[in-house]
């Protein structure tokens, strides 16, 4: 069985995908490395929003919560419930990871739908949601893969690898490829949906009066939120699956 070469080729393919370019890009040279400036700018903006929100959320909490405090507590409770549902009773240590993934993707997606990035002129290319770039989605999917391997090894030790021959050793190649293709599916699903949503809005705005694309933009906001939920749910489900050892 050529299991190892297949797995290596899958990882190599994932690395090659991170170099895929859609449209023009504006680059910065940092320490001898060429990086996508658009992705860094919009990602830093999203991170600033999240950090600012976190500072506001933990500053001066009230015994009788304000509307803002109620909102942040609801978001935290939602993420905790999501993690507990997918991972089980040992969900606690994974809440920060799942929450970070969900919130970063959610705010990134909505920033692409709500913020007028395109009015900011760049020498090449244009600004868009961070998740509109395959490099970002791959960068989000790879830590998810590391997380579920880490969760399984921490819970079961080397016995974790026994799942690859369940229910029969004949399925060994398929079970191995399944784990190594999970980041591929996560990356392409998020990237494809966000890119398609932004392209549809751009085309409609260029073809019809400005009022007509508004319903499509609201639909884009809805699907953007759903994509963040799907990514976080699948990430938590993969972690829970690796700890329980079932498929």
Curated annotation (Swiss-Prot):
Record Pfam families: ATP-synt_A
GO cellular component, one term: chloroplast thylakoid membrane
PROSITE patterns: ATPASE_A
Molecular functions (GO terms): proton-transporting ATP synthase activity, rotational mechanism
Gene3D superfamilies linked: ATP synthase, F0 complex, subunit A
Topological relation to the membrane, as annotated: Multi-pass membrane protein
Chain ranges passing through the membrane: 38-58, 95-115, 134-154, 199-219, 220-240
CDD domains cross-referenced by the UniProt entry: ATP-synt_Fo_a_6
Assembly behavior: F-type ATPases have 2 components, CF(1) - the catalytic core - and CF(0) - the membrane proton channel. CF(1) has five subunits: alpha(3), beta(3), gamma(1), delta(1), epsilon(1). CF(0) has four main subunits: a, b, b' and c.
Protein's recorded name: ATP synthase subunit a, chloroplastic
Biological source species: Ranunculus macranthus
